C-alpha cells in the first residue's frame, strides 16, 4: 500500500468527483482511478459508489476515511518530528570527557573558546566517564570529540590512523598526601620493601591510571607502593588523600589549592616523581557535522588553554 493512494482517496472523497480530484492532485483521471482501485483491492471492499454522477462514499468508505486521515496525519507528524530531531542533532556537538577534566577543565576551556568565537555553540552535550568508556563511546561514533589526558608512554585506543588530536594544554600528575604533625608528608616516597607507601590507586579503566602506571615503570628508584584504595575518580582519591589514607598521583590543576600552607595536602616527594601530561582533544578523521568541523577549525587556529 502506498500513501499516495490514501491522498488520492481523500481527494476524491473531498471533491466527490474523479475529474476534479485528479486536477487537484495534478494527475490524469485514469491514473487516479487506477490508484483508487488499487487501494480498494488492498482494503478488500469498494470505497466509492460510482453509480451516480456525484461520487459518494460507501459504508466501507465512510469507515475508512477517518483511518486514512489519521494515518496520514501521524505519518506527516512523525516525519516532521524526525526532521526536527535530525536538525537538532546536527547542530549539537557531543563531547566525551574523563571525569577529572569534565570537572576541572572543560567549563573554563569551553568558555574561553566561545568568548574568542564569533558564533558560540548552540547545542552542547557532555558525557563524563572513565577513559575506557570514553574510548568506547568514540569508537562507536556516539561523540564527536574526546577530552582526555595523554602521555606518550601510555597510548590509548584512539592513538592511530582513524583519529587525530590537538594538544590543548598541559598538566602534571604530582604525588600528594596529607602532612604529619610537623608538616612533612605522612606517606613519603619512595618507600621500601619493608615499608611500602600506602597508595591510593586509579582503577584499570582510568586513563590517568594507565599513565601513572606506565610512567612509574621508568622511575629510578621505582616507588614501593601498597594499594590500599582504588577508584577511577580523581576527586575521590583526593578526598581520601586529604583524609590521610595514603598517597595519590593527582593533577596539579586539581590539588594546587590544597598545596598551600594549611591547605591539607603536601607533596610526597620532590619533582623527580612528577609525571608531565598533556590535555588532548581527539576526533575521528572522518568528516563530522558542519558545526563540529567549524569548531575544530577554530581550535586549530586558536590558542591553547
For each feature predicted by the language model, list its residue ranges.
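N-terminal helix-turn-helix
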Residues: 1-70
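Secondary-structure junction motif
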Residues: 182-220
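Central regulatory/effector-binding core of bacterial HTH transcription factors
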Residues: 90-155
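Short amphipathic alpha-helical coupling segments at ligand-binding clamshell hinges
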Residues: 60, 64-67, 105, 109, ...
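Short beta-strand->loop
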Residues: 162-170, 260-275
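A late-sequence structural motif
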Residues: 266-305
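Hydrophobic hinge/microswitch elements
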Residues: 129-134, 139-142, 149, 205-267
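Acidic, Gly/Pro-rich loop/turn segments at junctions of secondary structure
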Residues: 129-195
